[in-house]
């Protein structure tokens, strides 16, 4: 099975249908993006189902009947078709279902997908077909979205501290909506992009989140009025307020409290005769806990309706919500070492029954897809591709590189493995591929696309 490179990503299952690709992508190159094409105009008139059908053909998305084929069977069927020692199975059906749930729970909140979470071509194209907008944090992310044929009005440049070169690029391609949180940024924008539409990012209480951003981004509520006054003096257009409660948010109160802060900024702006029309509630949405998601979205629905008039546009920046559950990583054991109790070195473990311990070396590690264990607080669980009747034994899972910190999981227990056995890890779609490197020459795994939603259901989107 062969793969091709697109935006730096290896996409497998390519059917190499150039006509379909041209129709779907609506690709004028970025430096030609000011020219409207017949293809992009006609494509915009297609239904969601028709757009998804084009995307599925381009990515060669295979149907997956989960009632008949388990994830283990699906992975096993791919082993004879690839020579790679690690690969992803991506279910676009998960992304579609997450979008349906979003529309049901937050019908008045427009999602701007956080590209940094998973910038792969499959995820971006499926979300584009569904009508999702994009949160970009860099020139490269903006380029990747514009290359889909996305109108620049569907992008928010949500990085409060931007490079001058990136500001110039955004201006050249009419990406106007962007965040700021300090005077220096206002001065840059005044000089290099004075027509920009600005969103003031405030610092909410993010103490109830796993990953907090308040120490780096967001202006304190007491300093908001001064920044608004400065923007007005510079004749810059401030259109709204944003916040981010942090990744892995644990309480809906964080959104409620932040929205109350946003309302106070709206009141400040009103006294300065500045009309704000946009609220960006940021990210922090879970992709796997429906109960928590339902609770958070209820708070957002009720609080935005209570605090803001209907003409105020509400947007959000979900990332892991769409991507996390969509990807499963399959990885093989490339080496194995038996460890004596007295020779367990950096990863000591003592067992009461002198059970043998093992070091297993996997084809992917923390410099690759498992970087989420270091930077995203992910808890990964190794699952056996083939069932085993053996008793679990103590072990440590290492990645393939020559660095000793390349430890995927230490002091765990799984049945004894042999070289060539396969493990798989679920919920690996968020902050894995995006942050992986080619350290030691180990390239990121390819992605195989499938769809678990029946055709009849897709027709009703």
Swiss-Prot record:
SUPFAM superfamilies xrefs: Alanine racemase C-terminal domain-like, PLP-binding barrel
Pathway linked to the protein: Amine and polyamine biosynthesis; putrescine biosynthesis via L-ornithine pathway; putrescine from L-ornithine: step 1/1
One GO BP annotation of this record: putrescine biosynthetic process
Compositional bias per record (Low complexity), positions renumbered to this chain: 13-22
Disulfide bonds: none
UniProt cross-references to Pfam families, sorted A to Z: Orn_Arg_deC_N, Orn_DAP_Arg_deC
Binding site residues for substrate: 375-376, 403
Function in brief: Catalyzes the first and rate-limiting step of polyamine biosynthesis that converts ornithine into putrescine, which is the precursor for the polyamines, spermidine and spermine. Polyamines are essential for cell proliferation and are implicated in cellular processes, ranging from DNA replication to apoptosis.
Subunit structure: Homodimer. Only the dimer is catalytically active, as the active sites are constructed of residues from both monomers.
Protein name as annotated: Probable ornithine decarboxylase
Species: Dictyostelium discoideum
Lineage: Eukaryota, Amoebozoa, Evosea, Eumycetozoa, Dictyostelia
């Amino acid at each position: 099975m062969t793969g091709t490179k697109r935006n730096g990503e290896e996409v497998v299952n390519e059917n190499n249908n150039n006509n379909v690709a041209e129709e779907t992508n609506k690709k004028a190159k970025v430096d030609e993006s000011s020219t409207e094409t017949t293809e992009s105009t006609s494509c915009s008139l297609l239904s969601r189902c028709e757009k998804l059908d084009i995307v599925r053909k381009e990515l060669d998305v295979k149907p997956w009947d989960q009632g008949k084929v388990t994830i283990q069977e699906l992975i096993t069927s791919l082993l004879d078709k690839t020579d790679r020692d690690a690969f992803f199975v991506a279910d676009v059906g998960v992304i579609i279902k997450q979008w349906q749930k979003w529309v049901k729970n937050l019908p008045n909140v427009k999602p701007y997908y956080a590209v940094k979470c998973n910038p792969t071509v499959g995820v971006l194209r499926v979300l584009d077909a569904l009508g999702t907008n994009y949160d970009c944090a860099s020139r490269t992310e903006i380029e990747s979205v514009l290359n889909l044929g996305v109108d620049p009005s569907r992008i928010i440049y949500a990085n409060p501290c931007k490079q001058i070169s990136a500001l110039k690029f955004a201006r050249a391609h009419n990406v106007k909506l962007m965040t700021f949180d300090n005077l220096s940024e206002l001065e840059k924008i005044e000089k290099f992009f004075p027509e920009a539409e600005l969103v003031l990012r405030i610092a909410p209480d993010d103490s109830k989140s796993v990953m907090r951003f308040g120490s780096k981004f967001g202006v304190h509520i007491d300093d908001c009025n001064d920044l608004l006054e400065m923007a007005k003096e510079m004749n810059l257009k401030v259109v709204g307020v944003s916040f981010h409660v942090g990744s892995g948010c644990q309480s809906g109160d964080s959104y409620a409290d932040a929205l109350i802060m946003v309302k106070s900024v709206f009141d400040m702006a009103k006294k300065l005769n500045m009309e704000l029309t946009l609220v960006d509630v940021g990210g922090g949405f879970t992709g796997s806990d429906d109960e928590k998601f339902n609770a958070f979205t209820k708070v957002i629905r009720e609080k935005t309706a209570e605090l803001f008039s209907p003409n105020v546009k509400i947007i959000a920046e979900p990332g892991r919500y769409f991507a996390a559950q969509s990807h499963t990583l399959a990885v093989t054991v490339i080496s194995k070492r038996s460890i004596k109790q007295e020779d367990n070195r950096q990863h000591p473990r003592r067992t009461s029954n002198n059970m043998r311990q093992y070091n297993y070396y996997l084809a992917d590690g923390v410099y690759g897809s498992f970087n989420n264990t270091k930077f995203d607080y992910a808890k990964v669980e190794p699952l056996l591709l083939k069932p085993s009747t053996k008793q679990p034994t103590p072990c440590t899972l290492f990645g393939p590189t020559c660095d000793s910190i390349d430890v995927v999981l230490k002091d765990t227990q799984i049945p004894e493995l042999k070289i060539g056995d396969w493990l798989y890890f679920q919920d690996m779609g968020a902050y894995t591929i995006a942050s992986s490197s080619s350290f030691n020459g180990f390239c990121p795994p390819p992605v195989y696309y499938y769809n678990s939603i029946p055709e009849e259901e897709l027709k009703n989107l």
